[in-house]
């Protein structure tokens, strides 16, 4: 982990929600770095928002992208290749830390370098509320899924919605 990058991502998230005028809930808790801890802490804190997953991937031929999806969804690499025109592979923990500074299990979909393409799985729109880690593994944000597009429009990243399956 790179604490300065994580702090930057966290502050970028606070600014993003403010600029987009999107309400959110915030919790501080023990660090969540895997699905078991996520589920346990979620039950303890009474979370009802849908947990998201941010898969950080490298694109064949250069560059990176991130897939924002539901925690239980699986990567459809054929669909991603169809959309990007190139194959992708999930980055190793070391590559991810080097590129964006996030801890494995605490990758944030917002506040990333502008050259990272953000792919959005349409499944996330089927939930009332979404939650994610804003860079810091001991923090969780939740917001209305209906506000996702307001947030995405404020990002400097290229945002590509995946077609529904």
PLM region spans:
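Extended, low-hydrophobicity, polar/charged segments
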Residues: 1-165
């Amino acid at each position: 982990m790179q604490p300065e990058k994580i702090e930057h991502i966290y502050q970028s998230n606070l600014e993003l929600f403010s600029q987009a005028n999107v309400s959110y809930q915030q919790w501080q808790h023990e660090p969540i770095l895997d699905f078991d801890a996520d589920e346990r802490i979620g039950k303890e804190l009474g979370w009802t928002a849908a947990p998201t997953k941010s898969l950080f991937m490298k694109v064949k031929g250069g560059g990176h992208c991130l897939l924002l999806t539901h925690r239980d969804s699986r990567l459809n690499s054929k669909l991603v290749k169809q959309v990007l025109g190139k194959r992708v592979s999930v980055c190793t923990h070391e590559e991810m830390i080097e590129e964006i500074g996030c801890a494995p299990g605490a990758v944030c979909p917002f506040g990333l370098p502008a050259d990272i393409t953000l792919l959005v799985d349409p499944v996330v729109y089927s939930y009332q509320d979404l939650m994610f880690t804003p860079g810091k593994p001991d923090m969780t944000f939740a917001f209305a899924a209906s506000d996702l597009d307001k947030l995405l429009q404020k990002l400097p990243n290229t945002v590509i919605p995946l077609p529904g399956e």
